């Protein structure tokens, strides 16, 4: 029996500040929403590409950030999710007594998406800051895409060695999901540090050259990992 995963991975929330800060405020730090906390009705988004101001369609900031509206140029919601073609199989083993079920992952890959209806663009942003803010959010999107590609590479190695044997199909699925959550959690901890480092390097002060360095770095990494993406 072949099955699809009905599971999103996680949601990244990142923003661009208006003014320089001596220290990155707590509200401005990139956040991750874990698997079980993501709303079931979250709108679909689009996979990695160049962003435009028109991609930010949320009418307002989330309630927890509304009081900081004047300090935020842009707010981006990006998500890493399991691809639609990811699937696993559960087969009944007749040679064993009592009868049990074997679960294996046939294909597992991840993709990054930007969610326009949850992403906000400050209508009062200064014209001189539009390019900088858009580039900043583009880099966050790129970091999320790179994390998705790394998860896909790691998943290939991990999934090929995974076999789950349980008494019922439901138990098999639950065990597979539990293993999957562990894989995702480890990846999140590493990538969260990278998003935070980027914000600390570029949000505490206005530095086009430093942000351009980050853009060059992630662009090169995207080129180097493109073949792995196509192999999803």
Positions of predicted regions on the chain:
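Metalloprotease/metallohydrolase-associated module, dominated by Zn2+-dependent proteases
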Residues: 38-110, 114, 121, 162-232
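Positively charged n-region of N-terminal signal peptides that target proteins for export
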Residues: 1-5
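Mid-length scaffold segments of soluble, non-membrane domains
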Residues: 105-106, 111-161
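Bacterial N-terminal signal peptides
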Residues: 8-18
């Amino acid at each position: 029996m072949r099955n699809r995963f009905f599971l999103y991975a996680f949601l990244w929330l990142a923003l661009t500040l208006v003014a320089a800060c001596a220290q990155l405020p707590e509200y401005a730090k990139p956040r991750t929403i874990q698997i079980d906390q993501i709303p079931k009705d979250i709108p679909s988004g689009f996979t990695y590409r160049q962003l435009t101001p028109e991609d930010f369609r949320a009418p307002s900031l989330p309630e927890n950030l509304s009081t900081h509206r004047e300090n935020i140029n842009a707010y981006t919601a990006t998500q890493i999710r399991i691809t639609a073609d990811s699937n696993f199989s559960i087969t009944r083993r007749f040679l064993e007594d009592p009868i049990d079920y074997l679960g294996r992952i046939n294909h597992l890959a991840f993709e990054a998406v930007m969610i326009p209806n949850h992403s906000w663009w400050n209508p009062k942003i200064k014209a001189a800051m539009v390019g900088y803010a858009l580039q900043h959010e583009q880099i966050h999107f790129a970091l999320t895409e790179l994390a998705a590609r790394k998860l896909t590479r790691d998943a290939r190695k991990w999934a090929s060695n995974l076999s789950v044997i349980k008494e019922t199909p439901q138990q098999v699925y639950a065990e597979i999901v539990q293993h999957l959550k562990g894989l995702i959690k480890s990846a999140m901890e590493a990538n969260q540090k990278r998003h935070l480092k980027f914000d600390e390097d570029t949000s505490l002060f206005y530095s086009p050259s430093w942000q351009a360095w980050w853009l060059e770095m992630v662009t090169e990494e995207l080129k180097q990992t493109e073949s792995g993406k196509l192999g999803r």
